[in-house]
Swiss-Prot record:
Any single GO CC term annotated in Swiss-Prot or TrEMBL for this entry: transcription regulator complex
InterPro entries noted in UniProt: Mediator_Med23
Biased composition, class Polar residues, residue ranges: 1346-1367
Family statement drawn from the similarity comment of this UniProt entry: Belongs to the Mediator complex subunit 23 family.
A Pfam family annotated for this UniProt entry: Med23
Primary role: Component of the Mediator complex, a coactivator involved in the regulated transcription of nearly all RNA polymerase II-dependent genes. Mediator functions as a bridge to convey information from gene-specific regulatory proteins to the basal RNA polymerase II transcription machinery. Mediator is recruited to promoters by direct interactions with regulatory proteins and serves as a scaffold for the assembly of a functional pre-initiation complex with RNA polymerase II and the general transcription factors.
GO biological process, one term: positive regulation of transcription elongation by RNA polymerase II
PANTHER family: MEDIATOR OF RNA POLYMERASE II TRANSCRIPTION SUBUNIT 23
Name listed for the protein in its UniProt record: Mediator of RNA polymerase II transcription subunit 23
Length: 1367
């Protein structure tokens, strides 16, 4: 091949001897040149046609090599003309020629003439190259230009500029050689943010990149760097807050020239999240950190160090380190964060200590030094045994810096808890010294002179063998010697002995013959807080080991109340999670269960129900799964344990947070049975109600009409297989539409009330006719017998006023688990009986018998009976009768009311501050003993039956606390039925005080007002009553201003029915300002300080958000008006809203409005329609400037030239950034139904792109269907605008954005719809968008790996595999 080629081309360039002798004197005529060209091409065409396809590239490369081997510019020029003609006549493919020319090793900038001629040829033929080829050529030319040094002779610059001209042609928008989006991607790869382009390209490249700033702006959320989340403890996080773990930057899609602040590390965001208590899961989610992979994260380390420095600065200004003060809470939280992140090796301890030293050097911050050493001691004492001494020595460097004293530091007052912090440095020295002595290290660290008095005090205290609990000496010794087993035994032994009891003394517990070890006073929280994590771990390990030992030995003596309460308190510490709650759920519970230690099992479940706080949702769902397993075991079929298991399960189900339900239940999609009850209809109904509430509050089903393809389907189907049931129409109407549709399709035939009555009469006749006792007992207690026995007992009491001994024996034989079905039938039977009652005397008789069954005979507990009644599905009049029975049971006799009022009056919900809970608990049970084994009936029968069943230990529970989760359900049922509103008000008046003991009163109120927003419209009095009852129940246990604002308390609580209070704008401003100040960490904050470990909410912002939403939903103002008033806080000029941090206010509005029901936030759509229809966007003459300046909120705001459109844009972004994907899923419908008909101008179109563009990434990740619909809507709008306009001024930014959308998000998923639209556009637009359609059947221009590198995505015929296809 080479020989043939050589002969063809040498023939055409050969010269005569005379020409060589007189170079430059001879010249071919144009005709001769042309003849040569034609003959050369003819010979080459013949050769080329005989060449195989595979050899084409090799052939072209040889030709280029041949040309570049020539030294005469004239020859090179002539041969290039040959190549040009070959390309122009279609003989050679232009892409192959261009690539061979540019990639030739001989093409060097020093050969200036060759360089100039080559790029002139490329410029001439590049128009024929396909867009993918042009993209590759652009990349190759840019890389070639990089070989030109920074300084060259000015003589050669002119020739080098030929390359620039090719680049200019490629980048020429009107030439449309390739999508400009590809060009900017290649340029930004070579010249990322902050890197200047090569001097040869001058401003050509930077000007071109600048034309993409509008596209970048369209894809950016206004003020994104100022938006902050509210941290919740469920760890639920959407993709909005993800950061790059190496740089802390936002993960931006595409290599666009985004605004500078978006490329900055988002330290403020991470720092804010780190500062929040219970934020560690969110931090891990934001940075993509996985506990299983030990990966050090230096940026996280830096922020932790900065937080410590900030705490040191705060301590410097605080007068005293008071109990529960801001500074103490901050140090407590810091300690917890540090241990977690260092323990999982996300941060390095020695690196952090050295960094701290560097940042504190020369600052003179020493007031907080003891607290800092206390934080460091936590980690050192727990990990020094497993790590090298060298890792901990940098602490001594820090000591030298922070403890400059030459004289001895005096011993602090050890009666105060702060003394443990003052001793922290001495404790650190003791641990370091112990490690040095034990290791091979010859290093001895002498005790610093300033710590000598502290050290001597500890030594002396250790010699005192009788340690008292009245000061902090024991804690000090535990902290100092926790790594020295000889010395540690004494103080730890003293702690343990205090709570275990001495083994001889006994104290009674509620119920018959139930005794416990005699220690009743738990270790106070102050003391537990004063122990290091290492000491706490030893203590909790000791307790868990003792519990397991007692479980194995099946001890008849119950655990000491002090031990149980202390164990509960230790479980609140997140730092000891592995031995704490994780060990409790994964090891202790299963071990106790296997040992059949039912008393201890009952105790552990009681602890979980009444003493646990902020337990992560996966542990709670794991426990729920355990409970369903437990419920099926024969040994748990006894009244007290069965009741406890069901009550605990009910609490777990109803307490699931709305954002927790989906992430937790999707973990069980393969086996939904594990989290559902096989036999308890009430628990499964409670789960469905929780599911309905969660999907409503999170707007999961918004825009959907079916549960097909969702995570709910299998769960609901399994429930209907286990416990088929129906829902009353008034309950069903509150469900989200897809759930309503499911239950209408899966309707279960109901037994008629008449049949029930007939069956009861039939069985009662049988009962009266039978005489043989054994036969009766067998007949009525056998499995498979209709569950009508309670109905028969009712009949006996109605007719004979007593129950025989056989009745008692049947009840006992039936067993706890089977009896639930009897209660269910009895609930239906009662409704029938009361419905058909003649009233008057007969009704009173019915009421008396029912109350006797509960309180006199103890046949069924009040909470179980009411739960069954509340969960039945009666309609109309029967539903009212059912609720009437509930009201009678709760209020008619004094039994329950007295129990409630005495319990509320004598007890406090702040159990962590109490030392005498056990005493109060026992006196309450003595006054109102729990009777769970039909004691009343056993005493009444003739002859009386002695009770055999011993009681399991009860440490915390009683009928009032057991009733609370049932009361939650009762209130909801009453809300659903309009005619029983007055009855609900009466219940709240008499029993509302119980909410003092609810573990999540504000969340319950928030969920209720949110879920029943439609039911409660125009029922302002009931709304007010509900809020007053629940919030008012806590008035004695919460400081003033903890929840509702003073303005609300003053006006709304006292408003008259005929004259409801309508707040002014200033009210809404103050309410938003309260959340803004809370999130900014203002000190003192708008809300009183509290110990967040025992609070309903994990941190101040979560508390502020929920109480604000409750107050707004409680107003006697329609949701639409409240929503508009919230938007007006920033959209109208408000004197109370400071200009300088307007985005913080928008952030707060976004958080609040998205946490409210749909009528509150949907008003934003109306505002957007108003702005889009306004003259500033519809009239071409109204705003003569640049639209991107008009939409740039930050620039407009800073220059005081803001307009309503930029404010509305920024506010919409803040709202949508905080929205759930369910709320966002209304955007496609909003675009097509509300905006598409009105968008006629370019400004309007660009405004819509600005609005929705930044959220395409969320749609791609979470709901692809919506992304596809939005993509099509964008093209429909473009068609509208194109048809309504004579000329488009901003065609390029529009097209750039559409290319970005295609290559980053939609791929080919919208190809078919879009092709039809593009065909109908005007030629100029159609030319620019031709690469999007497949009309020309052009290939994609990007390799598949580009998706991850920020380059355009590949095209395919389906939705890209990376897109999650969701509902």
């Amino acid at each position: 091949m080479e020989t043939q080629l050589q002969s063809i081309f040498e023939e055409v360039v050969k010269t005569e001897i005379i020409e060589e002798a007189f170079p430059g004197m001879f010249m071919d005529t144009p005709e001769d040149e042309k003849t040569k060209l034609i003959s050369c091409l003819a010979a080459f065409r013949q050769f080329w046609s005989g060449l195989s396809q595979e050899s084409h590239e090799q052939c072209v490369q040889w030709i280029v090599k041949f040309i570049h081997g020539q030294h005469s510019p004239k020859r090179i020029s002539f041969l290039y003309d040959c190549l040009a003609m070959a390309v122009e006549t279609g003989l050679l493919p232009p892409r192959m020629v261009c690539e061979s020319l540019i990639n030739s090793d001989s093409l060097e900038w020093e050969r200036t003439q060759l360089w100039a001629l080559t790029f002139k040829l490329v410029r001439k033929i590049i128009g024929g190259v396909d867009y993918k080829g042009v993209r590759d050529l652009l990349k190759a030319i840019l890389e070639k230009i990089l070989t030109i040094p920074n300084t060259v002779s000015s003589a050669v610059v002119q020739q080098l500029l030929a390359a620039r001209e090719v680049i200019a042609y490629i980048l020429e928008r009107n030439a449309c050689l390739l999508p400009a989006y590809f060009a900017v991607t290649e340029i930004r790869k070579l010249y990322p943010e902050g890197k200047l382009p090569h001097w040869l390209l001058g401003n050509l490249v930077s000007d071109f990149v600048d034309t993409f700033r509008p596209t970048a702006r369209i894809n950016s959320i206004c003020g994104r760097c100022s938006l902050l989340p509210v941290v919740n403890n469920s760890g639920a996080i959407c993709n909005s807050w993800k950061l790059d773990p190496a740089t802390l930057r936002f993960p931006l899609k595409g290599l666009l020239p985004y605004d500078k602040d978006l490329f900055e590390p988002q330290t403020a965001l991470l720092r804010y999240v780190l500062e929040q208590p219970y934020s560690r899961d969110m931090v891990c989610n934001m940075l993509g950190l996985n506990k299983q992979h030990k990966q050090r994260c230096p940026v996280l380390e830096d922020q932790l160090v900065d937080l410590v420095v900030y705490a040191m600065e705060r301590s410097e200004t605080e007068e005293k380190f008071d109990d529960g003060g801001t500074s103490q809470l901050l140090w407590q939280h810091l300690s917890s964060q540090l241990i977690f992140f260092v323990l999982f090796q996300f941060a390095s301890f020695p690196h952090m200590v050295l960094s701290l030293h560097q940042k504190l050097a020369g600052r003179g911050l020493i007031k907080g030094r003891d607290h800092l050493m206390w934080v460091l001691l936590q980690f050192i004492s727990g990990s020094i045994q497993k790590n090298a001494l060298a890792d901990f020595l940098p602490v001594m460097k820090l000591f030298d810096l922070l403890y400059p004293e030459k004289e001895c530091i005096p011993v602090p007052d050890i009666n105060k808890p702060q003394s443990t912090h003052a001793f922290a440095m001495t404790c650190i020295w003791i641990h370091l010294n112990r490690k040095a002595q034990n290791g091979d290290s010859t290093l001895q660290i002498p005790i610093p002179h300033s710590l000598k008095l502290h050290h001597e005090f500890l030594q002396q205290s250790l010699r005192n063998k009788s340690l008292q609990m009245n000061d902090y000496k024991i804690a000090l010794l535990c902290n100092a010697y926790s790594t020295n087993s000889e010395c540690f035994t004494l103080p730890m032994g003293a702690l343990v002995e205090t709570i275990y009891g001495n083994g001889i003394m006994r104290v009674p517990l509620p119920g018959t013959s139930c005794l416990a070890s005699a220690s009743v006073t738990p270790l106070p929280m102050n003391l537990l807080d004063s122990l290091t994590v290492h000491a706490k771990m030893s203590l909790i390990h000791s307790i868990a080991t003792r519990v397991i030992k007692l479980a194995h030995t099946k001890s008849s003596v119950a655990l000491a109340p002090a031990l149980v309460e202390t164990y509960s308190r230790l479980l609140v510490y997140m730092e000891i999670e592995s031995l704490g709650i994780k060990g409790f759920i994964s090891q202790l519970l299963p071990t106790v269960f296997k040992s059949h230690a039912w008393g201890i099992l009952h105790t552990l479940l009681e602890m979980f129900s009444h003493r646990m706080h902020h337990i992560q949702p996966h542990y709670r769902v794991q426990l729920l799964s355990h409970l369903h397993t437990l419920a099926a075991v024969a040994q748990t079929n006894q009244n007290q344990l069965h009741l406890c298991v069901e009550s605990t399960a009910l609490r777990l189900i109803t307490a699931l947070g709305s954002s927790e339900v989906q992430p937790q239940f999707t973990r069980f999609l393969n086996d939904p049975k594990t989290v559902l009850s096989a036999e308890s209809e009430e628990l499964n109904r409670a789960l469905i109600l929780t599911l309905a509430r969660a999907t409503h509050v999170t707007d999961f089903f918004t825009g959907s009409d079916s549960i097909q393809g969702t995570w709910c389907k299998d769960i609901l189907q399994t429930i209907m297989n286990f416990t088929p049931h129906n829902w009353a129409s008034h309950t069903l109407s509150c469900f989200p539409a897809p759930l309503q549709a499911f239950f209408k399709q899966n309707n279960v035939p109901q037994e008629s009330r008449f049949n029930l009555k007939k069956n009861v009469e039939e069985e009662y006749r049988k009962w009266k006719s039978m005489t043989d006792e054994n036969e009766i007992i067998t007949q009525f207690s056998v499995q498979g017998f209709p569950p009508l026995f309670l109905c028969l007992l009712w009949k006996m009491l109605l007719e004979t006023d007593h129950i025989s001994q056989i009745g008692y024996k049947v009840l006992e034989r039936i067993g706890a688990r089977a009896l639930v079905a009897h209660v269910r039938t009895f609930a239906d039977f009662l409704v029938y009986e009361f419905s058909t009652s003649a009233g008057g005397q007969q009704l009173n008789k019915c009421i008396e018998i029912l109350n006797d069954m509960v309180w006199k005979y103890n046949i069924v507990t009040l909470d179980r009976l009411i739960l069954c009644l509340a969960m039945r599905s009666h309609e109309g009049n029967e539903a009212q009768v059912c609720y009437f029975i509930i009201q009678l049971l709760l209020l008619k006799p004094n039994d329950f009311r007295n129990r409630v009022s005495d319990f509320v009056k004598e007890n406090s919900p702040e159990h962590w501050l109490q030392s005498d809970w056990h005493t109060k608990h026992m006196s309450y049970h003595k006054k109102y003993p729990e009777k769970l084994y039909f004691e009343g009936l056993a005493e009444q029968v003739d002859p009386p039956v002695p009770i055999q069943s011993p009681y399991l230990p009860i440490y915390f529970g009683n009928v009032c606390l057991r009733f609370l989760p049932v009361f939650d359900i009762v209130i909801h049922r009453f809300l659903e039925l309009l005619p029983v509103s007055k009855s609900l008000e009466t219940l709240l008046d008499h029993l509302g005080g119980l909410y003092k003991f609810h573990d999540r009163p504000v969340t319950y109120l928030y969920n209720t007002l949110h879920y029943y927003e439609m039911c409660l419209r125009n029922r302002d009095h009931l709304k007010r009553k509900l809020v007053h009852a629940i919030i008012g129940s806590l008035k004695d246990n919460r400081p003033q201003g903890w929840c509702l604002s003073d303005t609300y308390l003053k006006h709304a609580m006292n408003a008259r029915e005929d004259n409801p209070w309508v707040p002014e704008d200033s009210y809404y401003c103050k309410l938003i300002g309260r959340l803004v100040d809370t999130m900014a960490g203002k000190s003192p904050g708008p809300f009183p300080n509290c110990d967040w470990r025992f609070n309903e909410f994990p941190n101040p912002a979560a508390h502020a958000l929920h109480v604000t939403c409750v107050e707004l939903m409680a107003l006697a103002v329609p949701g639409k008006d409240v929503g508009n008033a919230l938007l007006n806080v920033v959209l109208k000029s408000q004197p109370l809203v400071p200009r300088e941090n307007i985005t913080a206010w928008m952030n707060a509005i976004g958080l609040i409005i998205t946490a409210l029901p749909e009528p509150y936030w949907i008003v934003l759509h109306d505002r957007i329609v108003n702005v889009i229809s306004s003259s500033s966007l519809t009239s071409e003459t109204e705003w003569v400037g640049y639209p991107f300046r008009l939409f740039d909120f930050t620039a407009c705001h800073q220059s005081y030239s803001e307009m309503s459109c930029s404010y509305t844009l920024a506010l919409a972004h803040a709202v949508w950034h905080h929205s759930s994907i369910g709320q966002l899923s209304l955007i496609p419908k909003f675009l097509t139904e509300a905006l598409l008909p009105v968008v006629k101008t370019e400004f309007q179109l660009l405004y819509v792109y600005h609005l929705v563009g930044p959220f395409l990434q969320r749609f791609q990740q979470e709901r692809t269907r919506c992304m596809i619909e939005i993509g099509v809507a964008f093209y429909d709008m473009l068609l509208n605008v194109d048809q309504c306009s004579t000329h488009l001024n901003y065609m390029d930014p529009i097209c750039d954005f559409l290319y970005h959308m295609k290559y980053m998000f939609t791929g080919d998923s919208v190809k078919e719809q879009v092709e039809k639209i593009i065909c109908n556009l005007k030629p100029a637009l159609k030319l620019r968008l031709r690469f999007i359609t497949h009309i020309s059947k052009m290939e994609p221009a990007v390799p598949p790996q580009a998706l991850n590198s920020g380059s355009p995505a590949p095209q395919s015929n389906q939705v890209p595999a990376s897109l999650p296809v969701t509902q």
